[in-house]
UniProtKB/Swiss-Prot annotation:
PANTHER family: RIBOSOME MATURATION FACTOR RIMP (PTHR33867:SF1). It comes from the Bacteria. It comes from Lactobacillus gasseri (strain ATCC 33323 / DSM 20243 / BCRC 14619 / CIP 102991 / JCM 1131 / KCTC 3163 / NCIMB 11718 / NCTC 13722 / AM63). Required for maturation of 30S ribosomal subunits. Its main location: cytoplasm. The gene is rimP. Belongs to the RimP family. This is Ribosome maturation factor RimP.
Amino acid sequence: MTKVTELVADVVTPLAEARGDELVDVEYVKEKKQYYLRIYVDRRPGGIDIEEIANLSELVSEKLDELDPDPFPEPYILELSSPGLERPIKNEKDWERAKGSYIHVSLYQKIDGEKTYEGTLKDLNQNQIVLEVKIKTRRKEITIPRKVIASSRFAVEF
């Protein structure tokens, strides 16, 4: 996380938690000459609806406007949303929540000739995950060292 996203996370986390929500991620990016501050929040169980996101957006906007000095070098567009069904797996809490779920994993280097896998997360520890994947018509467990995981997210199984 950058200093800006860390500061935003520090501001948003207590606001979200006070409402029973969870801060999932913060992104501060520049796209086509425009800055965007994207904040992803969720609520367990059942998720968060658009009205709740709109209410939280107003609270967050007010708090960010009060920051002094202003941490944003340029004007930006504030976007609050749910992370969706394919939410990223970013921290240990997310990994524990993903146990037994169908996930997508992208790797820095190939394992068994592949750089991406989708399957059910069967087990994990600090060093590795065990993923049950379907190869043609058979299921196989693959052990993936966590240090080679570039990104991971929940996935929808078809």
